[in-house]
Amino acid sequence: MKKSGLLNPDLCYAIARLGHTDTWAVADCGLPIPEHVEIIDLALVFGIPTFEQVLNALKPEVVVEGAVIAEGTPERIREMVDTDVEVVTHEELKAQLAECAFVIRTGETTAYANVIFKSGVAF
């Protein structure tokens, strides 16, 4: 058993496969995700886990060099993203999901609590 960090095996595997510039997303529980995109579903019930809880668990595990959010994303979600952010329409964000390596579905119920991240490099 792992001593620390992420425990979800699907999430650990998905992160380990990421390369520089690959995209992936953290989403609220209502975001429509394209059928061909891998979903790592962490949602238990409405509100658990929150977007913030999931993002805080991910931050020590991944290198991020950019992010995409939709117009209307709440300021508290924007503030959690510690990188350069591109703002697009909600429809454009949903279209970009088709290119993501995976989407992590949270139990978050805040509208527009969705962020696409661009993987960076650790060296």
Curated annotation (Swiss-Prot):
| UniProt record, GO biological process | D-ribose catabolic process
Tell me which UniProt keywords the record has, alphabetically: Carbohydrate metabolism, Cytoplasm, Isomerase
Q: What is its EC number?
A: 5.4.99.62
Report the pathway entry: Carbohydrate metabolism; D-ribose degradation; D-ribose 5-phosphate from beta-D-ribopyranose: step 1/2
Annotated Pfam families: RbsD_FucU
User: Cellular component per GO?
Assistant: cytosol
Molecular function (Gene Ontology), one example: monosaccharide binding
- InterPro entries in the record: D-ribose_pyranase, RbsD-like_sf, RbsD_FucU
State the protein's name: D-ribose pyranase
Species name? Corynebacterium glutamicum (strain R)
Q: What is the lineage of its organism?
A: Bacteria, Bacillati, Actinomycetota, Actinomycetes, Mycobacteriales
